[in-house]
Regions:
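Oligomerization/assembly interface segments of phage tail-like spikes and tubes
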Residues: 49-74, 122-136, 259
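Intrinsically disordered, low-complexity segments enriched in serine, threonine, and glycine
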Residues: 144-285
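Short beta-strand and beta-hairpin "edge-sheet" elements
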Residues: 96-139
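Polar/acidic, low-complexity leader/linker segments enriched in S/T/G and N/D
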Residues: 1-43
Length: 285
């Protein structure tokens, strides 16, 4: 029950340094902007008659504010010095917020920091302000899943059926994965493709489109595709120019509900291994 009631935040700076307000050294006193982003709706007046019509809509960048206080005023000097040094302008932070047992993260730029110089005997406080250009909270898990995974089935106690034998593993011969996406807003995934032998022109299909790479692969090659950034790399080298012109990165977006993604190739698809990674996106915490 205490876990569900606890509210905490962990700031991870771009260089890996961390500061937490988890009721150990610092405790959170206020949060603003975490529950929902700002929505913008654009309208234009009707040429005739009353009212307007909607011309556009978007989710704006998110402003976040966190305020915290020292748990034990005896640590004022050390903790204040650490906070003043930790929060720096022009640096990106990953912010992990836990509220009512749910933890999600978001990335933001520090826009302001305040640490009032109050009475030295009272608990020191600070407020940190962030601008999150990508306004949606992300799931902590990236849900990596191999489409062509072999599912092991041996277990204890071991049983060997006299007619059907023993089921040692199950292969996904359909080369398709079906998953239920329960995020609040659509998201894109990243794919890593490897192979056991020669593969020609690998292709991923999902939603209303596909992405096909006009290239050959050999064992040991690693092909990575980022569908949000429209980035394709083979062994770390940019090969975006080898994407089939009929391909559509935007069509590979995952929406709330059931999603299906499959893979194929002109040659060698039986030896392909495709792992999908994605973070679920949420409006708030």
């Amino acid at each position: 029950m205490m876990e569900l009631e606890q509210v905490r935040v962990r700031f991870v700076r771009q260089d890996g340094k961390e500061l937490a307000a988890d009721e150990t050294d610092w405790g959170l006193t206020a949060i603003d902007g975490a529950a929902a982003p700002q929505y913008q709706v654009y309208t234009s007046d009707q040429a005739r008659g009353d009212g307007s019509f909607v011309t556009g809509r978007r989710v704006a960048a998110r402003d976040l504010e966190f305020s915290a206080a020292v748990m034990d005023a005896g640590g004022n000097a050390v903790l204040r010095k650490a906070a003043l040094s930790f929060f720096r302008p022009g640096v990106e932070y990953r912010i992990y917020l836990t509220y009512l047992g749910t933890t999600r993260w978001i990335t933001g730029e520090l826009t302001a920091f305040k640490a009032p110089s109050g009475p030295v005997g009272e608990a020191q406080t600070f407020s940190a302000y962030f601008l999150c250009a990508k306004p949606f909270w992300q799931s902590v898990d990236d849900f990596g899943q191999d489409i062509a995974a072999i599912t092991p089935c041996w277990g204890w106690p071991y049983m060997d059926h006299p007619i059907f034998g023993v089921r040692a593993a199950v292969a996904n011969f359909a080369r398709e994965v079906v998953f239920d996406y329960d995020g609040d807003v659509p998201s894109y995934f990243k794919a890593t493709i490897t192979c056991d032998g020669p593969v020609t022109n690998p292709r991923l299909t999902g939603g209303d489109g596909y992405v096909r790479i006009l290239t050959g692969m050999q064992q040991g090659d690693v092909l990575t595709i980022d569908f949000e950034a429209a980035r394709v790399q083979m062994n770390g080298e940019n090969i975006l120019a080898k994407v089939d012109r009929a391909s559509s990165f935007s069509a590979m977006k995952m929406g709330p509900g059931e999603n299906r993604v499959s893979f194929s190739a002109d040659v060698g698809e039986n030896g392909m291994h495709v792992v999908l990674y994605y973070n679920k996106q949420y409006l708030g915490v």
